[in-house]
A protein has these predicted regions:
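Core structural elements
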Residues: 111-113, 135, 513, 713-715, ...
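Conserved phosphate-binding loops in nucleotide/dinucleotide-binding enzymes
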Residues: 339-342, 598-609, 628-633, 640-644, ...
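Catalytic adenosine-cofactor/nucleotide-binding cores of aminoacyl-tRNA synthetases and other
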Residues: 366, 457-461, 645, 677-682, ...
Length: 897
């Protein structure tokens, strides 16, 4: 099989290329049955194009960086991110990652061979390879030079469990958003300067609802919609029985008050009554409420303003007022939004526009930080600046909460042996509940209830994310949004709805790409920066080598580590690049010199692992340092075809498209199949925990590779979800392969007995009986239609056409009706016609089915030509794809039969 694969390259040398890109799997996890599905689709079209006369290079790849690897190593070593650099050095940790990431290579290789997937495993691209990384650096420098790379302090999705920020495409992986039941509260924000009618009955409050009560201590504003109608309502607090006047959106009045109680005498209410009377005493537009002030709801910490130099001053007098926001709706809540600028992008935006300060803590280093640390818990007092604590923290109130986890998922006690015990965590009291109970006791809660809402989770830890302020590097992908949309319209998506829907809508709502990852094992961001803000983006190892020489001359470095290791700039051999390591911690030790003579340190971040895989069209070739011509002249770029699961729509498919658009103003692929999920026979997602996962090795062992492949391709279109049922595989084995094999077994003994070796000239069509002319007409119609289906990336239609021809036309009609012609004595012209007709049908079917069922097709074809010598190839996969003979097609005859 390997020799044949190699021959398929050498024999097609000089032929037109069909360019295929292999999406890199990660070898730190075992392959699953869904990989058989995806690889069968890829293999089918690459084999088909080879038979059509194209040179199809298929370079394998390994995705070796990123969170999946790091979290697996942390679990294996029994450590957390905080231990790296303390109990284990970064060098030791990364060495463990490098080793771990390839641990299942043997199993992947084994599956590749057993399922008959042709891909060049001897010369794979590996994303941790220094030459691969160098191309990534070159691409980043192109983005940097186009002003498409920038640094920003913004609110981003952040995974405390993984210890890093996440990009929007990571957050939109399937299953990341899920329904959760949380404790929610409608808080009472006591007014400082109420309107007169708001003071006539009890204490006046604004009502604001939140699904994250733990963010209430960080509240610094309330936001109203400018055109929304609001009402002032006289009533009682249902928990404390205290008189109050509350303000909320008019359309939501009856969501919080029982309509039956409207107009009941306020004076008649007694605590405990089911109906709490209420009376509307005022109506306002949102604009009428702007500027009204309220008391800080949970006054643990006073807000501060921080200037560019890190100096801070208390700023409570600028906070705690009502501001405007166009995004406020009356779909749920109270129509008044609680604003915590440190924990929400919209919150930060409207607060900044209105001059509202954020609620920052100042740590020991003098740095502003949100109230929650990077592990997901409230800061400890002894981690904070003493002056800040003295002037801005109510220690008596806050100390009870210091160190508390804002979500139980982040608490290490609920993670045992690296596995999160979600059930136990859900049953324990949460910080949200604790805060709500405290608010209830102090008359600050209007309503507390459980609420099911859709909340994002980390794609690798399965734990909730926070929206958190981080200093990160971004790719300005929004600048290329219109061009990405335009180029996407030129791509042939299968199905089309994925391109216009899931992918197209994603592009229309594009955000800038958060590139930074605060981790250790990955591609280092090649940007060096001085404290004064001077920057240098490095685009090659040679450039870095030369900049180190400048740094040595300036006295910031004593030696060039690359020179010491014998690295020769400009020599692109594997041996030369293996002398160095571009990963952390070694790259962090390099100090460069700015144009003004200041020291520059590397920005500590790694880059998003999805950039690694999205750059593979260029990095697999070490472009532009090598193979520049085949990319620039478009002979090996863009891809004619790629295929992966639908989950890659906002992953690999997007990053390929984004990088290609922004750097090359091109598509990265012309045709793409996004295959559906492989579910169990009942339509449930497969998982080891549920015991319904299918082992691909066991399935191939039990049923064979070809029946498995044929079943997956013909059962449903690749882009539909496949309900995997072993009964279906067995049916394919029996009905299709069994029927075809029985047809060959019928033919071969009679042909051998009569000495048929196809040495005679073809019996003219005019001398053949009608049934021969009919089956050959059907055969050539089949060739034409199957060829069209393969060419249109419709493998299911192709497979079903072949299936129907074999079962119905060939076996059920032709062989059944012609048996006596083969049984007859003598070697008549009629018998020869029957042999020639059936032989051509079998030989052609072997070629047509070869892309989907490579093993059986090859066996059948080689058995046939071994006797006749009609073809001199080492495999059916080196044969030419059948060509339809239009002169043989007789549609009238086909219809009549």
């Amino acid at each position: 099989e390997n020799d044949v694969f190699a021959k398929s390259m050498t024999e097609r040398e000089g032929c037109p290329s069909f360019v295929f890109y292999e999406g890199p799997p990660s070898a730190n996890g075992m392959p699953g049955i869904h990989h058989v599905m995806a690889r069968t689709i890829k293999d089918t079209f690459c084999r088909y194009k080879t038979m059509k006369g194209f040179l199809v290079k298929r370079k394998a790849g390994w995705d070796t960086h990123g969170l999946p690897v790091e979290l697996g190593v942390e679990k294996a070593l029994g450590i957390t991110k905080e231990d790296i650099g303390k109990t284990i050095s970064v060098a030791e940790y990364n060495a463990a990652c490098r080793k771990d990431v390839m641990k299942f290579t043997k199993e992947w290789t084994d599956l590749t061979h057993k399922m008959g997937y042709w891909v060049d495993l001897d010369n794979p691209y590996i994303t941790y390879d220094n030459r691969y990384i160098e191309t990534l650096w070159w691409l980043l420098k192109q983005l940097y030079s186009k002003n498409l790379l920038y640094k920003g302090y913004t609110i981003q999705p952040y995974s405390p469990a993984a210890g890093t920020g996440l990009s929007s495409h990571e957050l939109n992986q399937p299953g990341c958003y899920r329904d959760v039941k949380d404790t929610t509260v409608v808080g009472q924000f006591k007014m400082k300067n109420p309107k007169p009618e708001m003071t006539e009955w009890g204490t006046p409050y604004f009502l604001a609802w939140t699904t994250t009560p733990w963010t209430l201590p960080s509240n610094t504003a309330l936001c109203v919609g400018p055109k929304i109608d609001y009402v002032a309502v006289q009533t009682y607090n249902g928990y404390t029985g205290e008189k109050m006047t509350v303000v909320l959106a008019k359309p939501l009045l009856y969501a919080h008050f029982n309509q039956k109680a409207e107009g009941l005498p306020l004076e008649d209410y007694k605590p405990g009554d089911k109906l709490i009377p209420f009376k509307v005493v005022g109506e306002y537009k949102g604009t009428d409420l702007v500027g009204m002030e309220y008391e800080q709801l949970i006054p643990w910490v006073k807000p501060v303003n921080v200037d560019e130099n890190g100096n801070w001053e208390e700023a409570a007098n600028q906070a705690f007022r009502v501001i405007l926001g166009d995004y406020v709706t009356t779909e749920d809540g109270t129509g008044i939004v609680h604003i915590a600028p440190t924990f929400g992008a919209d919150d930060a935006f409207v607060a900044r526009a209105a001059g509202i300060p954020s609620l920052f803590m100042i740590n020991k280093k003098g740095e502003p930080r949100p109230m929650v640390d990077l592990t997901g818990k409230f800061f400890l007092l002894d981690e904070l600046d003493e002056k800040f604590v003295k002037e801005c923290v109510d220690v008596e109130q806050y100390q009870e909460y210091q160190g508390r986890w804002v979500k139980n998922a982040y608490d290490p006690q609920f993670t045992v042996n690296g596995k999160y015990d979600e059930k136990t965590a859900a049953s324990a009291e949460t910080l949200d509940i604790y805060i709500c109970m405290k608010m209830k006791a102090s008359n600050k809660a209007f309503k507390i209830e459980k609420h099911v809402h859709n909340y994002p989770h980390c794609w690798r830890t399965d734990k909730p994310v926070l929206y958190y302020p981080l200093d990160s590097w971004f790719i300005r992908s929004t600048a290329a949004k219109e061009r990405m949309i335009e180029l996407n319209k030129t791509i042939n998506w299968k199905p089309e709805s994925t391109g216009t829907g899931r992918f197209g809508k994603w592009l229309e709502n594009l955000n800038d790409w958060n590139l930074s990852r605060s981790r250790y094992w990955g591609t280092p961001l090649p940007i060096w920066r001085s404290e004064e803000g001077e920057e240098l983006c490095i685009g090659s190892v040679e450039e870095l080598y030369n900049e180190i020489e400048k740094s040595i001359a300036a006295g910031f470095m004593t030696a060039n580590p690359y020179k010491e290791k014998g690295f020769i700039p400009g020599e692109y051999t594997e041996d030369n690049y293996d002398k160095i390591d571009l990963h952390r911690p070694y790259v962090d030790d390099i100090i460069l010199v700015s144009e003004s003579g200041k020291p520059m340190k590397r920005e500590a971040d790694l880059i998003d692992v999805w950039f690694d895989s999205g750059a593979m069209p260029y990095a697999q070739l070490h472009y532009p340092f090598e193979n520049k011509d085949i990319v620039d002249n478009r002979s090996y770029y863009p891809a004619d075809f790629i295929a992966e699961g639908v989950d890659q729509t906002r992953g690999w498919f997007f990053t390929l498209h984004a990088i290609a658009t922004m750097v090359f103003d091109s598509v990265a692929y012309k045709n793409v199949i996004s295959n559906g999920l492989v579910l169990d026979k009942n339509g449930n997602k497969m998982s080891k925990r549920l015991g319904n996962a299918v082992d691909p090795f066991g399935a191939i062992e039990q049923y064979g590779s070809d029946p498995l492949r044929w079943y997956m391709i013909t059962n449903s279109s690749p882009w539909d979800n496949l309900k995997f049922d072993t009964d279906g595989v067995m049916e394919v084995t029996r009905k299709f392969f069994g029927t075809l094999h029985n047809t060959y077994k019928f033919f071969a003994p009679y042909a051998n007995l009569d000495g048929f070796t196809y040495q005679e000239a073809d019996v003219p069509m005019s001398k053949r009986p009608e049934i021969d002319r009919w089956i050959l007409s059907e055969l050539n119609s089949l060739i034409k239609n199957v060829d069209m289906c393969y060419a249109d990336y419709e493998p299911t239609k192709a497979g079903r056409l072949i299936n129907d021809f074999v079962n119905d036309n060939l076996s059920n009609w032709y062989v059944r009706l012609c048996r006596k012609r083969f049984w007859g004595t003598g070697y008549t012209e009629d018998k020869l016609a029957a042999y020639q007709t059936l032989y051509v049908c079998l030989e052609t079917v072997a070629k047509l089915m070869a892309p989907i069922a490579p093993f059986y097709a090859d066996k059948l074809y080689m058995d046939l030509i071994a006797t006749t010598g009609r073809d001199h190839v080492a495999s059916v996969h080196l044969a030419d794809f059948p060509v339809c003979d239009e002169t043989v097609i007789d549609k009238e005859l086909e219809t009549r039969m």
